[in-house]
Amino acid sequence: RCKMLNNRFAGDALKKVDTLNAAGIRMNGQIVLCKGVNDGKELEYSIQKLMEYLPNVESVSVVPVGLSKYREGLYPLEPFNAQDAGEVIDLIEKYQKICMEKYDTHFIQASDEWYILAGREVPEEERYDGYLQLENGVGMIRLLLDEFHDALKRRIIEKASGAKLPWEGTREISLATGRLAFPYLKRMSEELMQEYPGLRI
């Protein structure tokens, strides 16, 4: 950590957690995973170590390091692939089961990117423990899907009772999104267009 961040104090993170834990302060943590650096056995060790801080550490998210082409002079890192993502998910879900049995919380959470990269469906709402890590990209896709389908069901019921559309005739709209979220937006758009033939997205 000190070498990667070029900061000799960067290795003191757990000391700060110790101080906050001793004071009974509630925390939520994040592990930024770097391929070949802190994944695999190192990730498993980190999870086990952070479990010692329960219940004051309420949740920990695991997110892949963000990489761009502008990395000149930075620590050399490689992007994760689908197999890597599957292994990360499997390890996290293993410890989710352990934490549920021991502490009645899933505790460790995989960000949405892992499931998308691995080609797996995101977990059900219950696995997110109230979306404690939403700001870290954990559960955003599940929350979006659930809220969309709830709203669509309400609209179908309203339409069946004679409610009119908020527009007349046909309507065309455009959505801008990134590559990761595209499959989900596409799926929801198709469901919406199927329900409303005059709508084109």
What spans do the regions from the language model cover?
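Core AdoMet radical
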Residues: 1-20, 26-38, 57-65
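Short, solvent-exposed loop/turn segments at secondary-structure boundaries
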Residues: 3-5, 39-41, 73-79
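Aromatic/hydrophobic pocket-lining residues that form the small-molecule binding cavity
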Residues: 13, 43, 85-88
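Short amphipathic alpha-helical segment that frequently serves as the phosphate-/nucleotide-binding helix
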Residues: 14, 44-47, 189-190
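Catalytic cores of alpha/beta
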Residues: 38-52
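Auxiliary Fe-S-binding modules of radical SAM enzymes
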Residues: 51-53, 61, 66-201
